[in-house]
Regions:
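Hydrophobic alpha-helical segments and their helix-loop boundaries in membrane
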Residues: 1-263
Length: 263
């Protein structure tokens, strides 16, 4: 079995750092989208690796690694990076789900636009608006620095040769995936409740006054009220999204601890 000789250690350590960072970058919204060229992602990952490498080299000392272990370590670094990016993606996906739910209720369900931030697929108009709002908050607040801090702290605790993913980690990710629907419901529930109440009122009016044309009058009313509720709800959307991003630091630390103590 071939063994990596000592003069290759520096290259292998840098390579493992790079793979963890690049895997996280390609998962992150906007930065990881197809709108950003591949060379820019690779360049950013390379630059971040150059910064991280001298800071952690003293704490990450690689043993003699056979080639199969190097390959397994690369795969594990990619998985760790994907998991970190996934924690951020959960919030943006939850925001997109909220937009889809709102669009259906306010009559915009048939209007779709390309979403370059996450999936590069057609999503509803409201989903696009909320995703751009989330991106602005992500950039304007310290959320992006939470991501950088989280991936840096992971190098302090999670070894570059880490390959043991325990069931605790996957259970944690399963629970976090449920946050997509939680965020979507919490963001959209005020407008959904108003839309349901408005539909009930319009239905009662059609029942009481049969000459009342529900489709000619009711549909425009739903759209106008929906737009008004969207405008009124912007501060609520902003506060909730900011609260979700503020929890990233805690989630990164929780993931690092789970990996360190149960890995």
């Amino acid at each position: 079995m071939p063994v990596i000789v000592i003069h290759q250690y520096l290259l292998i350590e840098f390579m493992l750092i790079f793979f963890r960072i690049i895997a996280m970058i390609v998962i992150l919204p906007f930065i990881g989208s197809s709108a950003v060229p591949g060379w820019a992602k690779i360049g950013l990952a390379f630059f971040m690796s150059l910064i991280v490498y001298p800071l952690i080299i003293k704490t990450q000392i690689l043993p003699h690694l056979p080639l199969p272990m190097v390959i397994l370590s690369i795969i594990s670094q990619v998985l760790i990076g994907i998991i970190f990016g996934f924690l951020v993606l959960i919030i943006f996906t939850g925001v997109e789900v909220a937009g889809q739910l709102i669009s259906v209720q306010v009559g915009f369900g048939m209007i779709s636009l390309l979403n370059p931030l996450i999936s590069n697929q057609q999503v509803s108009l409201v989903s696009n608006l909320l995703n751009y709002l989330a991106l602005i908050i992500f950039i304007e607040t310290s959320a992006f620095f939470f991501v950088i801090e989280g991936i840096y702290n992971s190098f302090q605790t999670i070894p570059l040769t880490f390959i043991n993913f325990s069931p605790y980690i996957f259970k944690y990710l399963e629970l976090k995936a449920g946050d997509i629907f939680l965020i979507g419901i919490n963001l959209s529930i005020p407008i959904i409740l108003v839309a349901i109440l408005l539909n009930i009122i319009i239905a009662l009016m059609g029942r009481i006054a049969p000459q009342f044309n529900i489709f000619a009058v009711g549909f425009p009313i739903i759209i106008v009220v929906g737009l008004l509720m969207l405008y009124i709800s912007v501060p609520y959307f902003t506060d909730y999204i900011m609260m979700s991003f503020s929890g990233l630091k805690l989630e990164f630390n929780r993931l690092i601890n789970l990996t360190a103590y149960h890995g």
